[in-house]
């Protein structure tokens, strides 16, 4: 099994992306993963080796590295309400991703390897959310609502409503700016829009994800 990535598609012209969508890698990472994809496919076709590519869209869990945006959001917001951090800086708030849970995706990887014939599969939920939506959902667990003002690098998230009063930090109050945008966190050649179509996996593997977006954020 070879773990491919949705980054293979780059700025794809087709949406959602499936196994037949042309690849258009936009970063050194994606280019290296495309090489691995084709090596597996070539060896399978030439030497009849049982090898499969799983094209995984974004998958998260409690063990996700803290440098990734989802963990950066959840850890940063936790520090804010504990008074350990004053503000959370992020990049593109409108980047769109197809987020699933690693547990569901690991199950599909197992199913891929139980088939009689090797093949390649997209692993995705088919549901898309923005970084901004992830922030709002994470804040809902603290009873905090945001309003946004400004545009681009001047955009900021300000507390508009609080429904819980269990914060150690006295800075958590209506009108407090807690989210800011920084050019430091805009990646070069960032892919702004990814959405997967796992129809083939649902049909051939009888696979379906169980953990939705709201539960994923909660976990």
Question: For the regions a protein language model found, what residue spans apply to each?
Answer:
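C-terminal substrate-binding subdomain of Rossmann-fold SDR/epimerase-dehydratase oxidoreductases
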Residues: 64-72, 76-219
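SDR active-site strand-loop-helix element
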Residues: 1-5, 54-56
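A short, flexible beta-alpha/helix-coil linker loop
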Residues: 57-60, 96
């Amino acid at each position: 099994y070879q773990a491919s990535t949705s980054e293979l598609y780059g700025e794809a012209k087709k949406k959602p992306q499936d196994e037949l969508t042309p690849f258009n890698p936009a970063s050194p990472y994606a280019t290296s993963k495309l090489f691995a994809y084709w090596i597996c496919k070539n060896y399978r076709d030439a030497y009849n080796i049982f090898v499969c590519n799983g094209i995984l869209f974004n998958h998260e869990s409690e063990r996700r590295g803290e440098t990734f945006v989802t963990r950066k959001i959840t850890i940063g917001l936790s520090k804010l309400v504990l008074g350990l951090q004053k503000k959370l800086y992020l990049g593109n708030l409108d980047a769109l991703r197809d987020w699933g849970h690693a547990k569901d995706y690991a199950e599909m990887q197992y199913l891929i390897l139980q088939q009689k014939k090797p093949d390649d599969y997209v692993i995705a939920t088919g549901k898309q959310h923005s970084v901004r939506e992830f922030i709002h959902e994470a804040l809902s667990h603290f009873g905090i609502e945001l309003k946004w003002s400004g545009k681009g690098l001047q955009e900021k998230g300000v507390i508009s409503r609080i429904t819980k009063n269990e914060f150690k930090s006295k800075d958590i109050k209506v009108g407090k700016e807690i989210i800011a945008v920084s050019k430091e966190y805009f990646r070069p050649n960032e892919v702004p829009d990814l959405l997967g179509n796992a129809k083939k996996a649902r049909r051939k593997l009888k696979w379906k994800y169980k953990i939705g977006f709201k539960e994923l954020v909660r976990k």
